Amino acid sequence: MADVVVPTVAVPEAMPRYAMPGDAGADLTCRHDVDLAPGERAMVETGVRVALPDGYVGFVNPRSGLAARHGLSIVNAPGTIDSGYRGQINVLLVNTDPREPVHLDAGSRIAQLVVVPVVEAIFEPVEDLDDTERGQGGYGSTGVSAMPPVDG
């Protein structure tokens, strides 16, 4: 794994951290207590600003544990942090649970920041595209089950 230096402005307790060696995402925390009613969304401050190097992007992803336990997700997941952005990273959280409110204490881990290299595509105009086996099929066109049916 290559190291990429990312200049970061944050109070020490808000500094993004990898929970385990080899993790792809560094945890982002909330600066203040957050209360979300069922179906409610809120822009949550992390107190973190980064200067991603040219050629890199940051993706702000939901944390699977919050989704599984509380139905908490990110409205625009993944959020995109471009290399030229210097503002605070905010996370647009949403409580998808139809019945239970969610409370997060200040300092709770709310999202993961994944930093990856960017490949800049060159979009070339053409009259048509090559045929493939999949063709124009989308939205479930490849089926649901990955397992072959079991004869009974």
Curated annotation (Swiss-Prot):
Xref: SUPFAM superfamilies: dUTPase-like
Pathway(s) of this molecule: Pyrimidine metabolism; dUMP biosynthesis; dUMP from dCTP (dUTP route): step 2/2
Chemical reaction(s) catalysed: dUTP + H2O = dUMP + diphosphate + H(+)
Spans annotated as Disordered: 129-152
InterPro entries: dUTPase (IPR008181), dUTPase-like (IPR029054), dUTPase-like_sf (IPR036157), dUTPase_trimeric (IPR033704)
Example GO molecular function: dUTP diphosphatase activity
EC number: 3.6.1.23
Binding residues for substrate: 63-65, 76, 80-82
GO biological process: dUMP biosynthetic process; dUTP catabolic process
Keywords for this protein: Hydrolase, Magnesium, Metal-binding, Nucleotide metabolism
A Pfam short name: dUTPase
Cofactor: Mg(2+)
NCBIfam families: dut, PRK00601.1
Similarity section: Belongs to the dUTPase family.
Primary role: This enzyme is involved in nucleotide metabolism: it produces dUMP, the immediate precursor of thymidine nucleotides and it decreases the intracellular concentration of dUTP so that uracil cannot be incorporated into DNA.
Protein name: Deoxyuridine 5'-triphosphate nucleotidohydrolase
Species annotation: Cutibacterium acnes (strain DSM 16379 / KPA171202)
Gene name for this UniProt entry: dut
